[in-house]
């Protein structure tokens, strides 16, 4: 894994240095394999003058310290306007339409593997780019497949399904072959200051702020009723955009007379009436679906699964694989029938398909299929 391969010598790799442990170790491993490595730090969000929610300055400092330790150059680039136009505006539009988007997927598509790759190509003359994502690449019959990362708990293929096989072919994913614990061990052994740095969680542009506070600065909230699935009004919500299907916490519903002790879940967002519909129990019938329709399809190899294929999918990150059968309603709409009913499938999120270890691609969940 870390021995020099003569075919790598002279090949230039630009590593996306985030200031975290995964990109730090990626740069180190690629150097050990004989590549000519340089780092590139992206700034994707302009923080407020007073509150640096994304901690970009700290991350840049850590990235620079790692590059200094490894003896490699660190370049910087500002993609804030591209991020605003292609990721953030999409994020707001989806919330406004009552759906729950995944900005990380759009960031990978538009920024990390598009704007970054173009900059690395045109300005830095790269042969490859590399990221600290937990996925693997396999080259077979002239195309590059994307496989799940070895560490099943950290596998990030769900967030990368929009990549083309051409983008995968230009990308290296060194830590995808390792467990997270091994990555931290390597960083510690090499004396990299990021070895015990906490993994970033949540959405970069929100940072430590409360999600509701952040969203309300961009979209006006429209309070409305909370109703049971039987139509009884039992409370008020501050805005449908703050809630997602299957949500249990933060509903503000106390104990009600003549109701069981089972927790309440969001089972529907009625956009026409501006009503949040709730039901009791994680297996509430209104929470379950037997399948879905997805559109905005993207296949890593451009072909996609065959009509009638029995494969698996994930409708959210870290979900267990769901066995399913797929058929096509059109070139850009896939019909998915689950082997067993699934709870809290959410329009606006991504359905990502797998054939064993191979990430095939996916699409955006549009409509739920219920009996």
From Swiss-Prot:
It is found in: Cytoplasm. Disulfide bonds join 107-204. Its EC number is 2.8.1.13. This is tRNA-specific 2-thiouridylase MnmA. It comes from Shewanella piezotolerans (strain WP3 / JCM 13877). It holds the Pfam family tRNA_Me_trans_M. GO terms for cellular component: cytoplasm. Residues 154-156, 316-317 are annotated as: Interaction with tRNA. The record marks 133, 349 as: Interaction with tRNA.
């Amino acid at each position: 894994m870390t021995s020099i391969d003569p075919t790598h010598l002279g090949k230039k790799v630009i590593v996306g240095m985030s200031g975290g442990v995964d990109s730090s170790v990626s740069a180190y491993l690629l150097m050990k394999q004989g590549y000519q490595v340089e780092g590139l730090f992206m700034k994707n969000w302009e923080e407020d003058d007073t509150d640096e929610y994304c901690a970009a300055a700290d991350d840049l400092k850590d990235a620079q310290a790692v590059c200094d330790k490894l003896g490699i150059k660190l370049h910087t680039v500002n993609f804030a306007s591209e991020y605003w136009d292609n990721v953030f505006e999409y994020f707001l539009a989806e919330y406004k339409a009552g759906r729950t988007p995944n900005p990380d997927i759009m960031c990978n598509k538009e920024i990390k593997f598009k704007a970054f790759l173009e900059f690395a190509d045109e300005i830095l003359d790269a042969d490859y780019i590399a990221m600290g994502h937990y996925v693997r690449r396999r080259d077979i019959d002239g195309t590059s497949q994307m496989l799940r990362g070895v560490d099943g708990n950290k596998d990030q293929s769900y967030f990368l399904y929009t990549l083309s096989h051409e983008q995968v072919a230009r990308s290296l994913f060194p830590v995808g072959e390792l467990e997270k614990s091994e990555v931290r061990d390597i960083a510690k052994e090499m004396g990299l200051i990021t070895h015990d740095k906490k993994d970033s969680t949540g959405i970069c542009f929100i940072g430590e702020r409360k999600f509701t506070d952040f969203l309300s600065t961009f979209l006006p909230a429209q309070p409305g009723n909370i109703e049971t699935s039987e139509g009884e009004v039992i409370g008020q919500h501050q805005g449908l955009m703050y809630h997602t299907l299957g949500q249990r916490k933060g509903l503000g519903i106390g104990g009600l007379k003549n109701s069981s002790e089972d927790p309440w879940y969001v089972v529907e967002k009625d956009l026409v009436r501006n009503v949040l519909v709730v039901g009791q129990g994680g297996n509430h019938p209104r929470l379950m679906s037997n399948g879905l329709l997805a559109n905005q399809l993207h296949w890593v190899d451009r072909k996609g699964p065959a009509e009638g294929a029995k494969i698996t999918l994930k409708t959210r990150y870290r979900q267990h694989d769901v066995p399913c059968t797929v058929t096509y309603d059109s070139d850009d709409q896939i019909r998915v029938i689950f082997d067993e009913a699934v709870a809290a499938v959410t329009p606006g999120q991504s359905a990502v398909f797998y054939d064993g270890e191979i990430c095939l691609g996916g699409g955006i969940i549009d409509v739920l299929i219920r009996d």
